[in-house]
């Protein structure tokens, strides 16, 4: 990829991923991938996330033949149960009630696909989050202030949701929000893109 080549392509409709990628100050395009997100029989949740991140990148690459395409997917596990986006206040309260005082694991899958060469890099970046013991009143107060109904686990770590958390363990703190920038920086370097010296937007 030369410096006159097309920009990066982010295969995601998530505004959180767009905001994260913008931190690297690289020009990029956004494309909404159309993929079937149904898990395969016997597939672990982390394997599903990794497979979907690849499928999203491949879908975007179909219309971008000379680009570096970023695909990402995330699953949240509380023990053996997968937690999704609550969608409303009642489900969000139930999620936080179940999560309080416990540890949960976010698996954030990342794919970087070079649509010109066909090379594919993938990474699963886990983040363990320990939620504080919470009272019902605290949960209600948080939900009224933040309304995190579009976030898996009903907590926005980049905002007030950080107050729900006791500690977290991750090799890449941006993975929790949905796009592991440290891992992505390494992947881009493998494709000849030095984030620090590349022309900024």
Curated annotation (Swiss-Prot):
Its EC number is 3.6.1.-. GO terms for molecular function: nucleoside triphosphate diphosphatase activity. It is found in: Cytoplasm. It is an enzyme of class 3 (hydrolase). Coiled coil: none annotated. Its cofactor is a divalent metal cation. The record marks 16, 74, 158 as: Important for substrate specificity. This is 7-methyl-GTP pyrophosphatase. It comes from Thiobacillus denitrificans (strain ATCC 25259 / T1). The lineage of its organism: Bacteria, Pseudomonadati, Pseudomonadota, Betaproteobacteria, Nitrosomonadales.
